[in-house]
């Protein structure tokens, strides 16, 4: 880097690690806090699909891989099946993924006319709020309007033991978007976009700065993914 401020660096007391990995599938992601980064956003789109196929909960572009509404609906229905009460908001989330006529009587979907702080159980919903089904149906049968892709993903999460309504342990972000954040474990893709590669070839220091930010996000372990094209990547 041509123009930089001198800095003094001090090591931490504990050991860390830096590993070069062929593919993200080769990393054990089922425990701990993770930050997965790349220089360009499009590089991360296949990563999100891989995490879904592995049954892992994550945040990407500031959004959970399972929306709060879907989490509320699935969790709400299972709470009702256990004989517990849920909030009006959760009940509305449940109803929003049920078909009119087979799951909920017509005219009851919005659950109008109830106090906002009311707690509702299965019996009340059946007797007073048009619910046509009961605890004989598990969530993926009761919530018949849930998109199939989400149904498969939630099933994969549950099989892996992930708590789909918890705060995600894994964040997927561009390096720029992760500035200021950090994690015990960082996974870094070194591929460059065409624009970044061109800037790098003419001696632009910005690419150095970007990857300096990336590697310094790791608190314990840094995993460097081998690039698809060595001629268009940042070597670490």
Question: Where are the predicted features?
Answer:
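The feature marks helicase ATPase cores and/or their adjacent C-terminal helical subdomains
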Residues: 1-236
């Amino acid at each position: 880097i041509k123009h930089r401020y001198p800095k003094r660096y001090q090591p931490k007391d504990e050991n860390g690690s830096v590993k070069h990995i062929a593919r993200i599938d080769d990393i054990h992601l089922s425990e701990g806090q993770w930050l997965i980064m790349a220089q360009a956003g499009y590089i991360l789109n296949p990563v999100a699909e891989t995490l879904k196929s592995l049954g892992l909960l994550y945040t990407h572009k500031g959004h959970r891989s399972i929306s709060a509404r879907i989490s509320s609906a699935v969790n709400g229905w299972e709470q009702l099946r256990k004989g517990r009460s849920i909030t009006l908001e959760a009940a509305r989330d449940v109803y929003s993924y049920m078909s009119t006529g087979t799951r909920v009587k017509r005219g009851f979907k919005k659950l109008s006319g109830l106090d906002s702080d009311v707690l509702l159980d299965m019996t009340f919903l059946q007797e007073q709020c048009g619910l046509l089904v009961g605890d004989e149906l598990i969530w993926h049968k009761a919530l018949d309007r849930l998109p199939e892709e989400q149904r498969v993903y939630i099933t994969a999460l549950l099989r892996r033991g992930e708590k789909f309504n918890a705060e995600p342990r894994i964040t997927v972000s561009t390096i720029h978007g992760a500035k200021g954040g950090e994690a015990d474990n960082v996974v870094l893709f070194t591929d460059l976009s065409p624009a970044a590669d061109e800037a790098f070839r003419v001696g632009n220091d910005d690419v150095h700065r970007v990857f300096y930010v990336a590697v310094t996000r790791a608190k314990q372990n840094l995993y460097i993914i081998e690039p698809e094209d060595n001629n268009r990547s940042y070597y670490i």
